[in-house]
Swiss-Prot record:
Its cofactor is Mn(2+). Mn(2+) binds at residues 306, 331, 348, 447. One of its GO terms (cellular component) is cytosol. Catalyzes the conversion of L-arabinose to L-ribulose. This is L-arabinose isomerase. The lineage of its organism: Bacteria, Bacillati, Bacillota, Bacilli, Bacillales. One of its GO terms (biological process) is L-arabinose catabolic process to xylulose 5-phosphate. It is an enzyme of class 5 (isomerase). Belongs to the arabinose isomerase family. One of its GO terms (molecular function) is L-arabinose isomerase activity. Keywords: Arabinose catabolism, Carbohydrate metabolism, Isomerase, Manganese, Metal-binding. It comes from Anoxybacillus flavithermus (strain DSM 21510 / WK1).
Amino acid sequence: MLLLRPYEFWFVTGSQHLYGEEVLQQVEGHSRTIVNELNRDSVFPFSFVFKSVVTTPEEIRNVCLEANASEQCAGVITWMHTFSPAKMWIGGLLELRKPLLHLHTQFNRDIPWDSIDMDFMNLNQSAHGDREYGFIGARMGVARKVVVGHWEDPEVRERLAKWMRTAVAFAESRQLKVARFGDNMREVAVTEGDKVGAQIQFGWSVNGYGVGDLVQSIRDVSEQSINELLDEYAELYDMVPAGRQDGPVRESIREQARIELGLKAFLQDGNFTAFTTTFEDLHGMKQLPGLAVQRLMAEGYGFGGEGDWKTAALVRLMKVMADGKGTSFMEDYTYHFEPGNELILGAHMLEVCPTIAATRPRIEVHPLSIGGKEDPARLVFDGGEGAAVNASLIDLGHRFRLIVNEVDAVKPKHNMPKLPVARILWKPRPSLRDSAEAWILAGGAHHTCFSFAVTTEQLQDFAEIIGVECVVINEHTSVASFKNELRWNEVFWGRKQGLL
């Protein structure tokens, strides 16, 4: 996985001086115990740092300002162990710019029935302390995640861990750089968009680079580096017999290795973590990048075909949310309309990430009917099975919309021996008919990010943090209700942006 900086999450406990120093010491002790125990659990991808028990408006504001200034702090987790009058939190919450999670828990799991007294009641007040704090968040319209349950509960910890990855995706979003090689595919609408608006909203720096610059980087690759990479290919993947001996097939694979190394060097030199290509802008290149793109995606880079920079950035961020696992650029390619067994076959010309593979990928070389270049090498495989999501980010002109469809990937019942690309088969929820109708009504793109590892909840959380609309198509969706949701969202987001 493409390296991330060592992020951390600050744990801040709310209380007040009303209860005396002894109670505050107990509150701090309990808070430290929780943080220490959470840090022992490998489910968490990043560390927790206990900052303090805050008891005054000044302390609260200061810790929020410190969080804003810290490059390591990816989010703030708050918990009211006792009652903490929420007017104290106004100044701090007005300043806070980092993702916020409200953990509604308490130190003890069970009520000590035989020994409970008023001392215990005064100390363990999160049941109503967190409600007071929750009110001020609602009153101020603060975007925050609320997780409820005992801090030792595995489900609570799993939700915390996924939110941490989403918060880190937000941090990465604020510094994400996308390199565009060539422009968008000509006359295509949905891959266009407002790059300035995207940088303001998401933080993305999206810039174009001449294919000639990439070609020079490819030419600079040494033969020794190519040979070493070919050895790696032979170890990781199956390969057609002709690919293991001198000849045109071997040379095609060799060219993709050269492209991979040159492309990676260009991205590393510019600190890019996402990129696009297009088959219409390949001057000076022998092949459309195929195998090269697939392998870079597997390392954690975001990618979008035909100049689709929004999907490239989304793939990168979902890779972060997924820790690099089971996530790929995707396209709804063709339908299977068998009654009672409607399916969608997802694929692309070449560029599907092997992290979603169910079978050992095989390097093959086949003609590509568009682009006018030599036959490109690519990885061919069937995708895995299981629950997944397809996500699309579109530009509506006055705002962005994130569209999520929950799907179930299935194992193909038939071989596809003549299909020379990686592919995956899925059943969309609630059905192909209703999901496609809702998707089209929402303006969802034909390009998506497909993921086994990212959840709908994570994508909703990301949209909440970043401040964009998110609509979900799942087993509960009815088209009539979905159309109403789109209408209501138009009013809500228009008012939020001052357009109504």
